[in-house]
């Protein structure tokens, strides 16, 4: 069953080009992760991490549409998923951002992952607001 989790749209105090550049190097993510994320490891195009009750997850950047969105897909994770980071130019100095996580999970697994994923999205967007 396909399940979608979406963050609220927030505003980053950085222009869309600089924000895109920052988010397309996964080594930069460590500076923005919420406390609920543990065991974070990264390279330029890959990262892995653990969130609360969920198994360790791995992401690989698979698509970069300049200044528009970045797609990450699960890589060697127990739960198949992808995550999109959408960037929308607001003005010369700010960018609107929202995240979307798509997972193939059954109803029982959805109930298990819903809270940790929503917490992750909420915490991550709070951090984006502070950029």
Question: Where are the regions a protein language model picked out?
Answer:
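Short amphipathic alpha-helical segments
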Residues: 15-21, 53, 112-116, 120
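Hydrophobic-ligand binding "helix-grip"
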Residues: 52-94, 102
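Intrinsic-disorder/low-complexity, polar/charged segments enriched in Ser/Thr/Lys/Arg/Asp/Glu/Gln
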Residues: 3-9, 46, 56, 82, ...
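Amphipathic alpha-helical hairpins
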Residues: 10, 32, 69-70, 115, ...
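Hydrophobic ligand-binding cavity/cleft-lining segments
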Residues: 1-41
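Hydrophobic pocket/interface hotspot
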Residues: 19-23, 29, 47, 61, ...
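A conserved amphipathic terminal alpha-helix motif
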Residues: 102-131
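Ser/Thr- and Asn-enriched, surface-exposed coil loops between beta-strands
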Residues: 41-45, 65-68
């Amino acid at each position: 069953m396909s399940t979608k989790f979406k963050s609220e749209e927030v505003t980053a105090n950085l222009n869309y080009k600089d924000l895109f550049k920052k988010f397309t190097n996964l080594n930069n993510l460590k500076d923005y992760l919420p406390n609920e994320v543990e065991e974070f490891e990264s390279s330029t195009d890959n990262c892995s991490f653990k969130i609360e009750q969920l198994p360790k997850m791995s992401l690989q950047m698979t698509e970069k549409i300049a200044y528009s969105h970045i797609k990450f897909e699960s890589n060697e994770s127990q739960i198949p998923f992808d995550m999109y980071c959408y960037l929308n130019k607001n003005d010369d100095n700010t960018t609107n951002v929202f995240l979307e996580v798509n997972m193939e999970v059954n109803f029982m697994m959805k109930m298990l992952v819903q809270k940790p994923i929503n917490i992750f999205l909420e915490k991550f967007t709070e951090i984006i607001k502070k950029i």
